[in-house]
A protein has these predicted regions:
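Conserved catalytic motifs of the protein kinase core domain
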Residues: 24, 33, 96-97
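Acidic-basic catalytic patches of nuclease active cores, encompassing PD-(D/E)XK
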Residues: 1-16
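Acidic active-site catalytic centers that drive phospho-/nucleotidyl reactions
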Residues: 24-26, 39, 59, 84
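Conserved catalytic cores of phosphodiester-cleaving nucleases, focusing on short active-site segments
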Residues: 27-47, 63
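Domain-level recognition of nuclease-like catalytic cores that cleave nucleotide substrates
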Residues: 73-116
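Mg2+/Mn2+-dependent nuclease catalytic core
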Residues: 43-69
Length: 116
């Protein structure tokens, strides 16, 4: 579902489920000239809260560290990069909502995601 949405939006998928020593990056893709590190969050029920709400400050910081590790390893530190989120919320009614949030947070943020 997330990959289909990203492709429809013009992203070029580079890699997915990238495992590093300290964690995993869900999707790495290019959106024009920008390298995007994409976190995919799904909530199976509204009782669990929204997918967006589940991305804590701790998770954001972890994603930043993972991305920096990846960029160093691939010698891409000069690349333009950003963090996007694909949020998938399944409602109790059976409906599913999927949302792409570009540039959700960055290295300099105080910890609050832009779309909250």
């Amino acid at each position: 579902m997330a990959l289909s949405l990203l492709k429809r939006q013009g992203y070029r998928i580079i890699d997915q489920n990238v495992r590093l020593r300290s964690g995993e990056i869900d999707i790495i893709a290019r959106d024009q000239d920008t390298l995007c590190f994409i976190e995919v969050k799904t909530r199976a029920s509204a009782a669990q809260g929204s997918a967006v709400e589940s991305i804590s400050l701790f998770k954001q910081r972890k994603l930043v560290k993972l991305a920096l590790t990846y960029l160093k390893y691939k010698k891409l530190l000069e690349e333009k990069a950003r963090f996007d989120v694909v949020a998938v919320d399944c409602q109790d009614s059976g409906e599913t909502y999927i949302k792409l949030i570009k540039n959700a947070f960055d290295l300099n943020d105080s910890g609050l995601m832009r779309y909250r």
